[in-house]
Amino acid sequence: VYHMLVDGGQYEGKRYLSLETCQLFMNKKSRISRRALGFDRPDPQPDKGPCADEAPKEVVGHTGFTGTCAWADPKNGLVFVFISNRIYPRPFDHKGLMTLKIRPRIQQLMYQALKK
């Protein structure tokens, strides 16, 4: 799905979604929320957002309860996926992953590496 969003609805040369459908799901839909249809987006205040400060405003993604996240960046042609298990061994002890902002920090390292 994220590759299709990056490629405007195509995957490996085959069209699955129209460009208009991709844009419908990727564009912000509310004045009171940063979210698009089914996807999260960067927060206007970067330090409060779910993704890296350097992520362009066009990125869309999802952060899952178990700690995973995925982001589609059509501007740079990137898909970022981070897989983790924040619920083991204690499902409601979110100190590490959430407090330390591990997911956006790893994504930030990716953007910094791309600049080199």
Residue spans of the language-model regions?
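Catalytic loop of the DD-peptidase/beta-lactamase superfamily, centered on the K-T-G motif
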Residues: 2-116
